Amino acid sequence: MNEPIRLTQYSHGAGCGCKISPKVLDVILAGSGAQNLDPKLWVGNTSRDDAAVYALDDERGVVSTTDFFMPIVDDPFDFGRIAATNAISDIYAMGGDPLMAIAILGWPVNVLPPEVAREVIRGGRAVCDAAGIPLAGGHSIDAPEPIFGLAVTGVVQKKHMKRNDTAQAGCVLYLTKPLGIGILTTAEKKARLREEDMGLARDWMCTLNTPGSRFGKLAGVAAMTDVTGFGLLGHLVEMADGAGLTARLDYAAVPRLPGVEHYIAEGCVPGGTLRNFESYGDKIAALSDAQRDLLCDPQTSGGLLVAVSPEGEAEFLAVAAELGLQLNPIGTLLERQTHAVEVF
């Protein structure tokens, strides 16, 4: 009998941990030319937001994003599901609604059979179906490692659009998914994942961030982004720096997957964690190693990081509960201090 194919053995990176580090990305973008200042471009790359938004008229904008990566799990169908869920998330993070997607596929055709790639596409299509959008086409290339993702188009009302740099002092921070995706998937790749933890990370990575569309319609939601490859601290630095504020994070209140402390102690910390910290660690007040290993953990298809005004909290929590989310605050935003983020 043939051994089952383990997709993670065919790639050097995994999921959003494949991202080029913020520090290196700065070097790449610094010499790439200035962005065209089109007044219809409501959101571009200046704030490192989740997606671009271009005006259709005075009230509506088209939301455009793309995301792709190498396998973070061995099962091809699940890889397709995770990659698609992660890509569509950027539309929800802007407060928008997805309209359609096209696939991006890189495949080592001389190494892995096309039937495996078909399962990846099937997984991606299943998620598009769940999101209520067509997978309308795509593009494929022969590549040395498997790569899959989507380019997604959505729409948003200008009054409901949520950016990552518009929070105000006094806002309360919420996170809709637990941290630890990178830690548990690293443990799985090293064959150290305990039986009781099997499937935990996969199930969270396959959970669509559809609540973002509802949160976008709440006036009390001042800013929103999704937590992906740069870890919670990386995306929180972007949110705080962009608004000229400091985020004060309550480490004990941050949701985390069961067993993360065990796996950190076992050395199951992905390489992206340290790359993340090296990129933005100077913007963060002193951390313990344990705090760094969790808070800089690269998330794939992570949750929404939401900044909510105090007067909008009750409505926000009511909507979250209606959507099946039991959320607790993880920190606050305050006037700028020495660092962009403080952890206590």
From Swiss-Prot:
InterPro entries named in the record: PurM-like_C_dom, PurM-like_C_sf, PurM-like_N, PurM-like_N_sf, SelD_I, SPS/SelD
GO molecular function terms noted in the UniProt entry: ATP binding; magnesium ion binding; selenide, water dikinase activity
Site described as Important for catalytic activity, located at K19
GO BP terms in the entry: selenocysteine biosynthetic process
Entry's Gene Ontology cellular component terms: cytoplasm
Q: Name the residues that bind ATP.
A: K19, S47, R48, D49, D67, D90, G138, H139, S140
Enzyme type, top EC level: transferase
Parts forming coiled coils: none
User: What subunit structure does UniProt give?
Assistant: Homodimer.
Q: Which domain of life is it from?
A: Bacteria
Gene this protein is translated from? selD
Which PANTHER family does the UniProt entry name for this protein?
Answer: INACTIVE SELENIDE, WATER DIKINASE-LIKE PROTEIN-RELATED (PTHR10256:SF0), SELENIDE, WATER DIKINASE (PTHR10256)
Q: Which reaction does it catalyse?
A: hydrogenselenide + ATP + H2O = selenophosphate + AMP + phosphate + 2 H(+)
**Pfam family, any one:** AIRS
Q: Which cofactor does it need?
A: Mg(2+)
Residues annotated for Mg(2+) binding in this entry: D50, D90, D226
Family the entry assigns: Belongs to the selenophosphate synthase 1 family. Class I subfamily.
Per its database record, what is this protein's job?
A: Synthesizes selenophosphate from selenide and ATP.
Instruction: Indicate what this protein is called per its UniProt record.
Output: Selenide, water dikinase
- Record's keyword terms, sorted: ATP-binding, Kinase, Magnesium, Metal-binding, Nucleotide-binding, Selenium, Transferase
Record has Metal-binding as a keyword? yes
Q: What is its EC number?
A: 2.7.9.3
The note on cofactor binding and number reads: Binds 1 Mg(2+) ion per monomer.
| Catalytic residues, chain numbering | C16
Checking SUPFAM superfamilies in the record gives: PurM C-terminal domain-like, PurM N-terminal domain-like
